[in-house]
Amino acid sequence: MDEGGGAGAAAAAAGNAAGAAVHHNARSAEDVFRDFRARRAGIVKALTTDVEKFYRQCDPEKENLCLYGLPNETWDVTLPAEEVPPELPEPALGINFARDGMIEKDWLSLVAVHSDAWLLSVAFYFGARFGFDKEARRRLFTMINGLPTVYEVVTGIAKKQTKVSNGSSKSNKSNPKPSKQSNSNSKPAKPPQPKDEEDSGPEGTEDEDQAYMCGACGETYANGEFWICCDVCEKWFHGKCVRITPAKAEHIKQYKCPGCSSKRSRE
């Protein structure tokens, strides 16, 4: 990351260009939600699959840094925009200063909470700019509320909530849960699906609860997607979220997700 005003200007340019794209092309709640979802995906990636890189970039010795989620599903840690007032609402300032003074998981959770607030502020900023009426604002909020928050994904709360939602309605299709294998070559390319309420019973295991959502982005499984399971934490991930293809998975004897790999390297 570049130092000084140049980095801040670059961040402002990136954020403002993204905002300009939405300004010119989007006029509906669905368009703003797509922008929200992409920025959220970038931030989730920073705090999960790219956490080692994110941790390094948040150097407490540097100036006030911010975490930006970008509309192309990437992220950037850089200085805040120099423009006053900024084109878009700004994320929390100085996230790097608390890094070494907190337990890592607590620090990541704090960044996640501030990121959730920023994502909402950007989405409803666009809503105000586009003159959304009550119904459009309600529709936008409903779509946003259908996704787990960044905080819920980072802390694992989203996986626990899945059990409640799955138990409240019956599934039309029952898919048995595949057995865990120690070798990734023999693992199925998709995660286990929620069982029918009558089959699963009132009590489910922690492992079953965590299998329904991607450990990186928090999204649920869709037919035809390639997923892979970590042999260490036994969480499931979209192949695209952890940059693993079916061909690459064939040659992996024991798969470790980015989170487990980064923990081992720092111990």
Curated annotation (Swiss-Prot):
Localization: Nucleus
Biased composition (Acidic residues): 196-207
Any one annotated GO CC term: nucleus
Zinc finger (PHD-type): 211-263
Domain of life: Eukaryota
Biased composition (Low complexity): 165-188
UniProt keywords, alphabetically: Chromatin regulator, Metal-binding, Nucleus, Transcription, Transcription regulation, Zinc, Zinc-finger
The keyword Electron transport is annotated on this UniProt entry: no
Site positions (Histone H3K4me3 binding): Y221, W227, D231, W236
Example GO molecular function: zinc ion binding
GO BP term (any one): regulation of DNA-templated transcription
Region Disordered: start-end pairs: 162-207
Predominant location category: nucleus
PANTHER family in UniProt: CPG BINDING PROTEIN, PHD FINGER PROTEIN ALFIN-LIKE 7
Family as reported in the entry's similarity comment: Belongs to the Alfin family.
Subunit structure: Interacts with H3K4me3 and to a lesser extent with H3K4me2.
UniProt comment concerning the protein's domains: The PHD-type zinc finger mediates the binding to H3K4me3.
Function text: Histone-binding component that specifically recognizes H3 tails trimethylated on 'Lys-4' (H3K4me3), which mark transcription start sites of virtually all active genes.
Descriptive protein name: PHD finger protein ALFIN-LIKE 7
